[in-house]
Amino acid sequence: MAAPPDLQDEPLSLGSPGSQWFGGRGDGEDEATAVMGARPAQQDGEPAWGSGAGAGVTSSRELCSGPARSPPVAMETASTGMAAVPDALDHSPSSTLKDGEGACYTSLISDVCYPPREDSAYFTGILQKENGHITTSESPEEPETPGPSLPEVPGMEPQGLLSSDSGIEMTPAESTEVNKILADPLDQMKAEAYKYIDITRPQEAKGQEEQHPGLEDKDLDFKDKDTEVSTKAEGVRAPNQPAPVEGKLIKDHLFEESTFAPYIDELSDEQHRVSLVTAPVKITLTEIEPPLMTATQETIPEKQDLCLKPSPDTVPTVTVSEPEDDSPGSVTPPSSGTEPSAAESQGKGSVSEDELIAAIKEAKGLSYETTESPRPVGQVADKPKTKTRSGLPTIPSPLDQEASSAESGDSEIELVSEDPMASEDALPSGYVSFGHVSGPPPSPASPSIQYSILREEREAELDSELIIESCDASSASEESPKREQDSPPMKPGALDAIREETGSRATEERAPSHQGPVEPDPMLSFAPAAALQSRPEPSSGDGASVPEPPRSQQQKPEEEAVSSSQSPTATEIPGPLGSGLMPPLPFFNKQKAIDLLYWRDIKQTGIVFGSFLLLLFSLTQFSVVSVVAYLALAALSATISFRIYKSVLQAVQKTDEGHPFKAYLELEITLSQEQIQKYTDCLQLYVNSTLKELRRLFLVQDLVDSLKFAVLMWLLTYVGALFNGLTLLLMAVVSMFTLPVVYVKHQAQVDQYLGLVRTHINTVVAKIQAKIPGAKRHAE
């Protein structure tokens, strides 16, 4: 048999894997035009799919061997051609849909001049996952041939250009690339509809392969990529060797390799004339087995973890005591490529919406209860039971429940709040674990729910016993902080109510008793109101008792007793009207001042009184600067003289008594920050009250008071004309040290004269007010 003609001088087709195909875009476009013009002729004989495959086989055979030559050994025709021609990408799918029933035409062309590349594995959907490495479809950056590499092609991945009707299996990761690449939406729909289609070799070829050992080098192993490439290279590098084999066997082998080859629509005119001959080809379609689906699903675990929408075969459960199971074996992949909608997944749930709403309302009703009695098993089996401890409102809001049910779809919800002293191995009430459980949705009477019912009944009994003991041991005010520490997951509304109640109690305790009967604080009344609003009456089926109102009634007498015991100390707090004295100085207090004014210690009172008189008389004769300087010199002369005297005396007497002013030096006269703050607050109080009073008088808030102030200022004008300021200060100091003593000695006579003076003053004031119309009406 003659050798096939050398095809290097001819422009290579798109199906050849050589580098000459990438030379220009014009050749590819001409070839695509030629193919589109001849498609109706290919559909006359057989169906579109079979005829396309048959034509491809015949054309490849005729092209390699010539019209008078027997067909050579089948060559693999792996090509990346269509990805490099954007114009061909736009024409080939659309023209196929117009002429035929939507099937893709396949033309297989063997190239005897160029060795095959590893592109045969590039277009397969199985993609040797078992070898543990990624294939060329996932990493096209590793070319194996001397021709231009795939990244140089301006298009996208070649397997994305073809629909899955042509025999290419696509994994879910590849389907996302197909959605981005296909320009025609009909091809996109077909690609999504048929994701798992594989064309396998018929059984006849396997039987004939045993009789022809020379062709065994062409067999492909899906699990050994290296062996596949080496065997194909040996079988193809002898283009001139004729192979006298039967045509059907060659066709079968060619069709077997078409599983790896792309579907090429662009052919030259010469190639198209040869491809009009059709030959029968047997096509078998096999479905992908479930283990393969599991392997492909395990390649993208991140997407499964992020998606919370389960398929009808999986039911996510929300539990409290079981940890999360992240093992791949526990995750069952969806049975179909598409995920169920939210309406479908919710319709298949084990808990209906009405039951969920009833459970939420029941949880709200039991939020502030302190004891709970166990429910019968039949009643709890109808709907999920929610149980919370008193003072621990760990109840999710209805919005949270609806959001969680919408996200998780079919779910079994168990809202169980753990008591910290009920069981040591139980998890906290705020802990929730998510896990996927394969199988049908559980029924309400499943063993897991029955187990949770028994567990909740046991915890309810323990809760009731603990609450009874805690009520006898301490009051509710002592229990609330401990419960807050035991259970951090508490709703913000309940925390706000507790804070407002405690703040109002502190305000009530600090309230002064001289302001009359204590009125109920609005903050204090708000917290119990909020608690009562969120505490509806329990249903008839609940046997739990509500001892909260009696406990609150018992707290009221205790709070009143505490507030009454603290009321005497509250009156001592300085206020705008209650405090009249400044805080005591560290070395001078009120009792010392009284002792000085009443001359109880004559020596000490004489020294202080003489010092004040000397200072004031000096100020009347000299300036303030001169008086300060002279007083400082006098004090220093006295202390220095005394210090020298003591030193000489100790030297003469040969004694060591130390410093004569040692006691005064060790005396603490510093003011602490608290004392300074007290003095500042007291001074601020007086200054603010004085400013307010002056504003009221000068702005005539009260006409009578303003007139009185005017009369006082008028009298002071006469006093100022007669006396100096220092003279008035001297008179005040003298009066301070003399009047108290005189009043003590002549108290009866002084009171009599003071009464007469007070009566006379009141008479004069009455006469003045009678002459002023506005003042008279104001007095009435």
Swiss-Prot record:
PROSITE patterns: RETICULON (PS50845)
Keyword check for Transmembrane: yes
Protein's cellular compartments: Endoplasmic reticulum membrane; Golgi apparatus membrane
Alphabetical list of InterPro entries matching this protein: Reticulon, RTN1-4
Keywords: Endoplasmic reticulum, Golgi apparatus, Membrane, Phosphoprotein, Transmembrane, Transmembrane helix
Gene Ontology, cellular component aspect: dendrite; endoplasmic reticulum; endoplasmic reticulum membrane; Golgi membrane; neuronal cell body; nuclear body; smooth endoplasmic reticulum
Chain positions covered by the region annotation Disordered: 1-76, 128-176, 201-223, 293-576
Protein role: Inhibits amyloid precursor protein processing, probably by blocking BACE1 activity.
Protein name: Reticulon-1
Phylogenetic lineage: Eukaryota, Metazoa, Chordata, Craniata, Vertebrata
